[in-house]
């Protein structure tokens, strides 16, 4: 009887993910056994300590370059860099999620099943403590993201996709204000996400069939097997290109790229604003981390086949995001279309055929994550008696009512527009220069032109805040608690520093741009 051979597992390399998933389980136990009055502080402490501990382990593993768990997980430069980015941005998002002083009772419904005006709902409105399931759900989502960017086979990537997606569907439905809008957004996200996951899984099946057609090789969906099958090019190209297309649909949905972006405006508008910021920053890092690994490792041999098609998707994404952002009258929907346009710019970096494209994309993800979290931090502060005032007409004259926070938001919008000495300029320059050097000049031209269009809605908000007279409906900016103040400070400072002194992070990204194979 042959001895069972188990795959080798490097638990130190997997420590960041294990810490986050373990913290999520601890959070479930806290919800069950810790007294209600203590839960919020305990949950926030557990989640934040887990994120910081996982980040410490990423730093400890910085020099590791290995594949573990039988080829399922790759620990390499891009995986570690993106895991670190996700954890830093998740810590910043937790500061927004944990804020309770901006709105009495917090931004989240006490329990997902609580109906409006019920006894539990009134209890929360009085400032009494409620349930805190938002923290373990966030930890589960972050844990899934850490696996997603390090997955070395398509089935592991699919499992990670579900682990990160399912908590997000629930988190989107937990808004305390505009509850029906929040639940509608979550339902749309869930249904469309289920379709996208089905496309991804069907694509995995087609790619497996493609690898099975290679003579003298075992079939599989790990990236090394796929790369070898693509290099030999003896199987049916219909299976390969069909599988690539379906897998790309699943990943582009998470990245909010056109034409798979339709969920983004509704979900960004309906979800609790801290969760919107979390998704805009961390989910985008995870999605593009997976895109980089799939197209630079598994399907690298088919680069010249998929580049024109994904290039068209990138241009369409930039156009849709920039043009439709001009028509928006809600600040969260405007930021949603801005996120879509930025997904197009990131695709330009993904398609650059060099390590500079990988490093530029990773730098862009970090820079954009800090800026967009800072933007949503400001959005949480502009409010009236009914909650956040997100309609643009309500922002008229905000610069006269609250010049400090209007000034911070103006700076962030200028960074989104790509003004020099901001992270928006350096990040766009990084991906555009890599694409231009790789012969993708047409994508650079499209990126520059759409950036000019996208600057208009940003400047319109700036003009509205500073050059319009405040009306009776102009809301006040509430004083933030220390958690929101910390998140806003980190985001604004990072946006400035990465615009003025970007080289250290660019060098770090360049040194982490090589995949293990």
Swiss-Prot record:
HAMAP family: NDH1_NuoN_1 (MF_00445). GO terms for biological process: ATP synthesis coupled electron transport. It holds the Pfam family Proton_antipo_M. NDH-1 shuttles electrons from NADH, via FMN and iron-sulfur (Fe-S) centers, to quinones in the respiratory chain. The immediate electron acceptor for the enzyme in this species is believed to be a menaquinone. Couples the redox reaction to proton translocation (for every two electrons transferred, four hydrogen ions are translocated across the cytoplasmic membrane), and thus conserves the redox energy in a proton gradient. This is NADH-quinone oxidoreductase subunit N. The chain crosses the membrane at residues 14-34, 40-60, 77-97, 131-151, 154-174, 189-209, 238-258, 272-292, 306-326, 334-354, 362-382, 404-424, 451-471, 481-501. Belongs to the complex I subunit 2 family. One of its GO terms (molecular function) is quinone binding. It is a multi-pass membrane protein. Its main location: membrane. It comes from Salinispora arenicola (strain CNS-205). Its EC number is 7.1.1.-. It catalyses: a quinone + NADH + 5 H(+)(in) = a quinol + NAD(+) + 4 H(+)(out). InterPro entries: NADH-Q_OxRdtase_suN/2, ND/Mrp_TM.
